[in-house]
A protein has these predicted regions:
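Catalytic core and acceptor-binding pocket of nucleotide-sugar-dependent glycosyltransferases
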Residues: 149-240
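A structural signal for well-ordered alpha-helical segments within the folded catalytic domains
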Residues: 16-19, 23, 74-78, 192-196, ...
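GT-A fold catalytic core of metal-dependent nucleotide-sugar glycosyltransferases
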Residues: 77-128
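N-terminal anchoring/stem segment of glycosyltransferases
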Residues: 1-66, 85-88, 261-264, 268-291
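Secondary-structure boundary elements
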Residues: 27-31, 82-93, 166-171
Length: 291
């Protein structure tokens, strides 16, 4: 199985999350598994090159992957397609950076080997969702793309995890791209289009199963995980840890103490902002630049 990540830019937080996620899979990998990072910042993955393959892309590649409608997240589908072509005999498991393997990796490998697709949690049908997603659905409801007429049987799955069996990869990805481009051509709301395209393509061409709770997607509690990742990276750097020692450090983390979901009150956020404005830091001093 090829375990795939895609990162853009040089914001440290994204790459720290990717690092943690990669380690969570590395500890259960066998000789026929590989980790592939597709990134615009390959220099941030030099340390991981000891146990992961890094594929460098640039802004021109991303722009090409966005397609004629310049839809940024179409690049996710194209990145999966690119790696699938590099490793046509491998099942592909794409992951967002803010994911972590909690359960047994074989619970992911088995359905892929049986020809079933995988995605994160089933969110339900877009007709019952909030404003922008609902507007998207109203535009595309009943329309036909690549021989598929969109209906109430087509639920939306979170795309933080996308698993594609290798024998069906070409068909699934061609269908996902046709859905994505067709919806964009028809003027659908430019939100979660790639997510819905992958959901429908996998449902129709491979069948679809959820990966939660084998994989946790902590999109609503990132700060806790970023801090844990930074502390781990610091220990690895400061101790000059070998890959084996690094893995033991990761295994020593008590991940059960890190929340995978936190509801943050808007009122608390507004009050914190207000207090910050009323009681600003004073007498702030800096080291002077040398002339």
């Amino acid at each position: 199985m090829t375990i795939l990540y895609l990162t853009f830019g040089d914001k440290t937080e994204f790459h720290v999350q990717a690092y943690l996620s990669m380690l969570s899979f590395r500890r259960q990998m066998t000789h026929d598994d590989r980790i592939v990072m597709v990134t615009t910042a390959p220099q941030l993955y030099r340390h991981m090159e000891q146990w992961a393959e890094v594929i460098s892309i640039d802004d021109r590649q991303i722009e090409a992957w966005q397609g004629a409608h310049h839809f940024f997240w179409r690049a996710k589908i194209k990145a999966i397609e690119h790696v699938s072509r590099l490793y046509p005999e491998d099942d592909i498991l794409y992951l967002d950076c803010d994911t972590i393997l909690y359960g047994d990796i074989n619970m992911l490998k088995q359905p892929l080997a049986e020809g079933s697709g995988l995605m994160d949690e089933n969110e339900g049908h877009p007709s019952g969702m909030k404003t922008k997603t609902l507007r998207m659905w109203r535009t595309i409801a009943g329309r036909t793309y690549d021989g598929i007429t969109l209906g109430m049987q087509h639920n939306m799955y979170r795309a933080g995890v996308v698993g594609i069996p290798h024998k069906k990869a070409t068909e699934v990805l061609n269908t996902a791209l046709a859905l994505c481009d067709g919806m964009l051509t028809d003027g659908a709301e430019r939100i979660v289009i790639e997510q819905y395209s992958l959901s429908v393509a996998l449902y129709e061409r491979a069948g679809l199963k959820e990966t939660y709770p084998v994989i946790a997607h902590y999109w609503a509690s990132k700060d806790y995980w970023i801090q844990a990742g930074l502390e781990l990276m610091a220990r690895v750097l400061l101790t000059g840890a070998t890959p084996e020692e690094e893995m033991r450090m990761y295994e020593a983390l008590d991940l059960s103490q890190l929340p995978i979901y936190v509801y943050k009150s808007n009122t608390a956020r507004r009050l914190k902002t207000l207090v910050g404005r009323m009681f600003k830091d004073r007498d702030v001093r800096y080291i002077q630049k040398r002339t």
